[in-house]
A protein has these predicted regions:
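Non-catalytic, conserved peripheral segments adjacent to functional cores
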Residues: 2-96, 104, 111-112, 120-124, ...
Length: 150
């Protein structure tokens, strides 16, 4: 198949040689890492979503193909953003997640492929658990629960 948009999730995973990221849960493949920054392909499906996690680095998300990706960003000041990453009307093709902000993403149907670029380079992440205190973001508590594994 020459058009990635016509592929199934399994076909995209095989075509791009993606691996399941343990814990966080999305499909990924490292594209570039030079010590100053790095980039990955990431892909979510209804079953394999990006669980709520926090990074020490700024992360730029850019939609590449497939269905829109619903991204939740919880900022340290108690504010939040709900972003629909995609190419259609009412969607945004890219969004920056500032360092120290909790983030998680899912897709309602199909699959969504994106690139995430970090600067400085990735050093690790903390994964949310049901025991984490997210009361500062009570207005999106239902969405937070959807994005926590366990």
């Amino acid at each position: 198949m020459s058009d990635m948009h016509q592929m199934s999730a399994d076909e995209v995973i095989a075509h791009l040689d993606l691996e399941l990221l343990e814990g966080e849960g999305c499909w990924y493949r490292l594209l570039w890492n030079n010590g100053s920054g790095n980039a990955i392909y990431g892909m979510v499906t209804p079953r394999e979503f990006s669980a709520l996690h926090v990074l020490a680095e700024d992360e730029l998300w850019v939609h590449v193909a497939g269905d829109p990706v619903d991204l939740l960003i919880l900022h340290p000041d108690g504010s939040h953003q709900q972003v629909r990453l995609g190419k259609g009307a009412g969607q945004t093709p890219s969004v920056l997640v500032p360092a120290g902000s909790w983030q998680g993403a899912s897709v309602a149907t199909g699959w969504g492929l994106f690139v995430c670029a970090l600067a400085p380079a990735f050093t690790g992440f903390a994964l949310a658990t049901p025991e984490h205190d997210f009361t500062a973001w009570a207005q999106v508590s239902g969405r937070i629960k959807e994005l926590i594994r366990g």
